[in-house]
């Protein structure tokens, strides 16, 4: 059976931050290639706070604001065809709030949103962040990925 190229499906349903679809696709492809992950499809949705809070309530019975929601679909080891790694739902506005709360430079906005995409990809691969040890491990993987993406000029940008 002929291998079809990876589809990175990106949807932008928010108006808080301009999102370049091709930039998101490049980031996802770079990460998955670096991590040697084989899949057919990955979905990334950028939503406003209201839509993400509603989804958070529907999925987790928690209507509070969040920065990302990840719904893994097929485990990396699955032989499903087509193999769908998962769906990432991201609030760019959460990145704005995060940087403002810490008095960080808003020039880091796209790097922070890039971190959210990487974070979701790691969740799709089975990483978790429920305990301090898991959070530390995940943050380390995120930082490695951001360094790699910076070197490859694959961080999100405006």
Swiss-Prot record:
Record-level Gene Ontology MF annotations: metalloendopeptidase activity; RNA endonuclease activity; zinc ion binding
Chain residues that bind Zn(2+): 119, 123, 129
A UniProt-annotated Pfam family: YbeY
Cofactor: Zn(2+)
Swiss-Prot/TrEMBL GO biological process terms: rRNA processing
This protein's GO CC annotations: cytoplasm
Alphabetic keyword roster: Cytoplasm, Endonuclease, Hydrolase, Metal-binding, Nuclease, Ribosome biogenesis, rRNA processing, Zinc
Cofactor note: Binds 1 zinc ion.
Main location: cytoplasm
EC annotation from Swiss-Prot or TrEMBL: 3.1.-.-
Subcellular localization(s) per the UniProt record: Cytoplasm
Its biological purpose: Single strand-specific metallo-endoribonuclease involved in late-stage 70S ribosome quality control and in maturation of the 3' terminus of the 16S rRNA.
Similarity comment: Belongs to the endoribonuclease YbeY family.
Protein name: Endoribonuclease YbeY
Record lineage: Bacteria, Pseudomonadati, Chlamydiota, Chlamydiia, Chlamydiales
